[in-house]
Amino acid sequence: MIHHIPNVLTKQQVAEFRALMDTAQWVNGKVTAGTLSASVKHNQQLSEQDPLTHHLSDLVIQAIWNNPAFQTAALPHHIIPPLFNRYDEHESFGFHVDNSIRLIRGTSQQMRTDLSCTLFLSEPEEYDGGDLVIEDTYGYHEVKLPAGDLVLYPSTSLHEVSSITRGSRFASFFWVQSLVRDDTKRHLLFNLDETVRSLRIQHGDGYPEVVKLTNIYHNLIRMWSEV
């Protein structure tokens, strides 16, 4: 399932990110690409060793851990420290699939990539082209969100960033290992949690069905989670 998570960063935070990124040194994006995807990857990114990458990454991690919508949709267990990229005119990243296993930066720990995340740092009117195109069983989905918004989608999906024809597109990207690896089960849990939230608003926390459904939710987490 594809999730749009709005307002992960405020407009002020985005402006601060962009001011720092405008003075940064960018490297060829192929440095983090797998053998197959390197042939279709044409962009730039901040070096993983750049102190600015670490600083901005920490701010993104803080924002997503404090975002209830992200927590509900992703059920995160491990998060790869976010990276940052830019696409200028004529740059693109053709259809590819993300690596299934990634090394967590600065450690010897490996993690499974269940969910891929793009946090947009450019407004849609700043560039033409540059859509994130995600393929699933229902077809192709073109995603271009306001700056500060995030899209979350299964890492099993083929996806691309279409060629930029005007301007520049800045974003943060990272991966999540979920407590629940199966996308269908995560989707069911998400819908159940949203139902509980709606009932709490309508009837209050003490409503018997709220208590019963909350019990079911947590028991399903116990049944399906991997920790």
Swiss-Prot record:
Q: What does the record note about the cofactor?
A: Binds 1 Fe(2+) ion per subunit.
Keyword Transmembrane helix attached? no
Cofactors, names only: Fe(2+); L-ascorbate
Residues binding 2-oxoglutarate are 169
Q: Which PROSITE patterns match?
A: FE2OG_OXY (PS51471)
Q: What is its EC number?
A: 1.14.11.-
Residues of the Fe2OG dioxygenase domain: 78-178
A Pfam cross-reference name: PKHD_C
Metal-binding among keywords: yes
Which residues take part in binding Fe cation? 96, 98, 159
Classification via InterPro entries: Oxoglu/Fe-dep_dioxygenase_dom, PKHD_C, PKHD_hydroxylase, Pro_4_hyd_alph, Pro_4_hyd_alph_FE2OG_OXY
Q: Which GO terms describe its biological process?
A: DNA damage response; intracellular iron ion homeostasis
The UniProt keywords, alphabetically, are: Dioxygenase, Iron, Metal-binding, Oxidoreductase, Vitamin C
Quote one Gene Ontology molecular function term. Answer: L-ascorbic acid binding
Name this polypeptide is given: PKHD-type hydroxylase ACIAD0531
Task: Give the source species.
Answer: Acinetobacter baylyi (strain ATCC 33305 / BD413 / ADP1)
